[in-house]
Structure formats: C-alpha cells, structure tokens
Regions:
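Pepsin/retropepsin-fold aspartyl endopeptidases
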Residues: 20-399
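Bacterial Sec-dependent N-terminal signal peptides
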Residues: 1-26
Length: 399
C-alpha cells in the first residue's frame, strides 16, 4: 500500500512539473491602429502623408530605417512659422556631418491616429526634393518605428501600424533577427571573386540595391578586380557625392538569393558605415521585393517574397542624374567618360524629351533612361537654345 501511494505521488509530481514547465508569460496580442497608403519613388523609397500638430496641410515623409530619429525639412519649418531650438546635437550621414536644432514635444497625425511627444531635428532636405521631384518635408525613423509594429505591403502600397505585442507572422516567409541599436544591423552573404560575409545596415530609406564602403571592398577582396566601375552621382546628408556602379555575382539574405546584383561603392570619408563593424547597407531596391514586418521591440524583421521578387534589376548606365530645379528636369554633374559626356551633355542642361517623348515628369524621365539600352535620342535646352543628341546607354551587366 505504501508503495502504491509513493508511486501515485511520483506520478502526480511528474505531471505537475511537466505542466508547470509549459507555463510562460506572454505579451497581449498586438492591435491594429491605422492603415496608411504610400507611393514609391526611384529605388522603391516609401513616401506617405501625415499632419504635423494642428496644421491642416499634409506633409510628405520618407519612411527610413536608416534614420535614428525623426526630422523635418528646414524650409518646411520656416513656411509653417515654427522656430526650432538652437543647434544642440550632431548627426552624421553619407557625405557630411551637421549640427541640428529641434522642435520638441510635437505630434504627428496618421489618418485618425495621433503619435505624440516627438522631437523632430531640423535639416535641409532641398537635395531630396530636387532628386525626387516632389517636396520632401521630413523623414520618419527610429522615433516612430520603435513604438509600433509595422506591416509594409508593397503590392497594395499600404503600411499597417500595430501596437506592440504578440504577432503571428505569415507563412512562406523568413524571420531575420537584427541587432537594433536605433538602427537595424544584419549579416548577409555576398559572392563575386570569392564568398564573403557582409555586415550591413537594413536601410529602407536608401533607393538602391547595395552600397559598399570602398574600405570594405578593398579589404575583403571579394569583388573581381576586372570588374569595370562606372562613376555616378549619389545623394547624402552633405549633398551630392560621387559613387561607383558595378555588378557582383550574388547576394544572399536568409534563404533568398539574388544574382548579378548592381552595387554602389563610395568613399566613406565620415565613416557612416562604421567600418570595420559594417561594410555598408542594403537598400529598398532589394527589400521592396518582399512584404516586410518591422518589429523593433522583439528585434525581428519578417520578409515574405511578393510579386516584385523576380523583377529585373536596372543595369542601364548613362551617367545622367536628373534633378527638378524650378519645375525643370536638369542634369547634375556629368561623370568623365560617361555616355552622357560622350554625347556632349553638360551639367545644368534642361532635359525636355527622350526618344521624342515630351511632357514627361521627372520620375518618367528617369525611368526612360533606366529601362533603355543602346541609342537614346535626347532633346535638351542649354542657355535658351534647343539641342539634340544621341546617347549610347550602357548595359553594365554585359561588361
């Protein structure tokens, strides 16, 4: 009888301990707050509208995981009659360092939902406005991203904001586990001359595929030395910066592989990439091929391939970067030896038509140059005189 009681006691304890071991505290389910539409600019950059404080006019904001805060354009602040505090903090970006002032304890309205207690730093975004051809009033980064879970659907062009909490991720995707210290950092695998690990910044605000620092490229020696590099112009915090365009064999993010990927290389004078900790960044020309869930609290990013996953990359190289100046599409700096220089184009030329198509918007002109190889007819104006030239656009994947 004693043995029977002992056996029953042991069985009870085993069952109790097993059940207790399965108990855990979990966060409540996340709740949907608001859905907002967005548009995409060159390179997949996300832009959406929001209201500041009680002002009635909507502002255009870029969603940027590469931003450690939230910011407003200095011209926008002036037009609203607001006065930021004196410069108090230094921020660093590609091409420059700036000391900035703040507008503190402000609110942002996304549809009917309000985000309060935001401290906006103030900076000049004129170069972004001219690059995209539409007014850029600010950039939304960590200050907002850290408060919510965001679902970004590139097919519907919508962003869903959720409260923090448990969330079931969709099937058929992959969960990345970044290290997030204001900015999300991850590791991928790249291959060309040889295979190499690549620590990168997950940057939805960058309208490109991959950006390497030249220090990383030189020290890793992963890129084939025979790869030809093409000089182009990029944009950063300090204005316009020179970059080189080339192609690498493959990029692997989790289980997803991209082949013959166009990449950019720049001289990181201000060590924005924190080399050797990071080698560069991966931008939204890659991540727009997924529907993305950002969960900063759990340090998780979920990717699900969407219908853009197999979209071809842009291999066209003309040497032209267009900017909107006083309502006109104007060429930026023309790189030496580029097709644009060989065609006789100069910085400041006004581009009126491509292949006899007049009346195109800035983004349409850019798309026309990026989607065409071979001979392209350009009609332009220089100092009031109409001129015509033929430019031979290069396919860099064939070089």
């Amino acid at each position: 009888m004693l043995r029977l009681r002992l056996l029953c006691t042991l069985l009870f304890l085993c069952c109790f301990l097993k059940t207790a071991a399965q108990e855990e505290f979990i966060d409540p389910p996340s709740k949907h707050l608001v859905t907002i539409p967005f548009v995409q600019f060159t390179g997949g950059v996300i832009v959406f509208k929001a209201l500041l404080d009680n002002f009635k006019d909507s502002l255009n904001f870029i969603l940027d995981t590469g931003s450690g805060g939230i910011s407003l354009d200095s011209a926008t602040v002036e037009s609203l009659g607001l006065k930021p505090g004196p410069p108090e903090r230094i921020i660093r970006g590609i091409g420059g360092v700036r000391k900035v002032g703040f507008l503190k304890k402000r609110s942002l309205h996304l549809g009917e939902y309000e985000i309060d207690s935001l401290d906006f730093h103030i900076i000049d975004y004129e170069v972004l406005t001219s690059l995209y051809g539409q007014k850029i009033d600010g950039i939304i980064g960590y200050s907002v991203l850290s408060r919510y879970i965001l679902k970004i659907n590139y097919e519907k062009q919508e962003i869903d904001f959720y409260t923090k909490g448990t969330m079931k991720y969709p099937k058929g995707g992959y969960l990345l586990r970044p290290y997030i210290r204001m900015l999300p950092y991850l590791k991928s695998t790249i291959s060309d001359n040889r295979k190499s690990g690549f620590n990168y910044l997950f940057d939805l605000g960058a309208g490109l595929t991959v950006l390497f620092s030249d220090d990383f490229v030189n020290d890793s020696a992963f890129l084939k030395t025979k790869r030809k590099r093409y000089l182009k112009q990029g944009e950063g915090l300090g204005g316009r910066v020179d970059m080189y365009l080339t192609v690498m064999k493959s990029l692997r993010i989790g289980p997803y592989r991209f082949r013959n990927v166009p990449v950019n290389i720049f001289n990181d004078d201000y060590n924005v990439t924190s080399y050797p900790s990071l080698g560069g960044l991966i931008g939204n020309e890659i991540f727009r091929r997924f529907n993305v869930i950002l969960n900063y609290e759990k340090q998780q990013i979920h990717l699900t391939p969407n219908r853009f996953f197999t979209s071809p990359f842009d291999y066209a190289y003309s040497g032209i970067e267009l900017y909107l100046v006083d309502g006109v599409a104007v060429t930026g700096k023309i790189p030496a030896g580029s097709p644009a220089e060989k065609a006789g184009l100069n910085e400041g030329d006004e581009i009126l038509a491509i292949n006899n198509r007049f009346g195109m918007q800035l983004d349409d002109l850019k798309q026309a140059l990026q989607s065409t190889y071979g001979k392209v007819k350009i009609i332009y104006r220089r100092k009031g005189v109409l001129l015509t030239t033929v430019m031979n656009v290069i396919n860099i994947s064939k070089k």
